[in-house]
Structures are given as C-alpha cells and as structure tokens.
Swiss-Prot record:
Residues 23-36 form a propeptide. Has antimicrobial activity against Gram-negative bacterium E.coli ATCC 8739 (MIC=3.1 ug), against Gram positive bacteria S.aureus ATCC 6538 (MIC=3.1 ug), methicillin-resistant S.aureus ATCC 43300 (MIC=12.5 ug), B.subtilis ATCC 6633 (MIC=12.5 ug) and against fungus C.albicans ATCC 90028 (MIC=50 ug). InterPro entries: Antimicrobial_frog_2, Frog_antimicrobial_propeptide. This is Esculentin-1ISb. Pfam families: Antimicrobial_2 (PF08023), FSAP_sig_propep (PF03032). It comes from Odorrana ishikawae (Ishikawa's frog). One of its GO terms (biological process) is defense response to fungus. It is found in: Secreted. Residues 1-22 form the signal peptide. Disulfide bonds join C78-C84. Keywords: Amphibian defense peptide, Antibiotic, Antimicrobial, Cleavage on pair of basic residues, Disulfide bond, Fungicide, Secreted, Signal. Expressed by the skin glands. Belongs to the frog skin active peptide (FSAP) family. Esculentin subfamily. Coiled coil: none annotated.
Length: 84
C-alpha cells in the first residue's frame, strides 16, 4: 500500500503545479487583453470625450458671455434712464 501512495502523491502534486501554471498564464492573457481594450477605447473614446467637453465648455462660455453682456446693457440702460 505504501508503494502506491508515492506515485499517487506525485501525480496529485504535478496536477496542482500544472493547474497553478495554467491559471497564471490565463491571468496574464486576460491582463494583456484588457490592456489592448484600454488602449483602443482610450484612443477612440478619449478623443470623443475630449471633443464633447470642449464643445460643452465653448457653449457654456458663449451663454455666460451673452448673459453678462445682456445684464451689462440692462444696468447701463437703467442708469441712463435713472430708474435704478
């Protein structure tokens, strides 16, 4: 019985080592895949997001500028008329 335990133990240990190595390789492959996805999305998505933000800032700047001008004209008109 003792002679059967050694080969069985050896097979189990080799199986565990093999499984561990496969899991490490699988994890490395998944990491590479996510890096590639990140690069693709950062190139495509980064430009799109950047353009959206810039357009939004420009539109907000225009609206704020127009509001300031309107307010300034209203205040100036009020002071000229003496109604303030």
């Amino acid at each position: 019985m003792f002679t059967l335990k050694k080969p069985l133990l050896l097979i189990v240990l080799l199986g565990i080592i093999s499984l561990s190595l496969c899991e490490q390789e699988r994890a490395a492959d998944e990491d590479e895949g996510t890096k590639i996805k990140r690069r693709i999305f950062s190139k495509i998505g980064g430009k799109a997001i950047k353009n959206l933000i810039l357009k939004g800032i420009k539109n907000i700047g225009k609206e704020v500028g127009m509001d300031v001008i309107r307010t300034g004209i209203d205040v100036a008109g009020c002071k000229i008329k003496g109604e303030c």
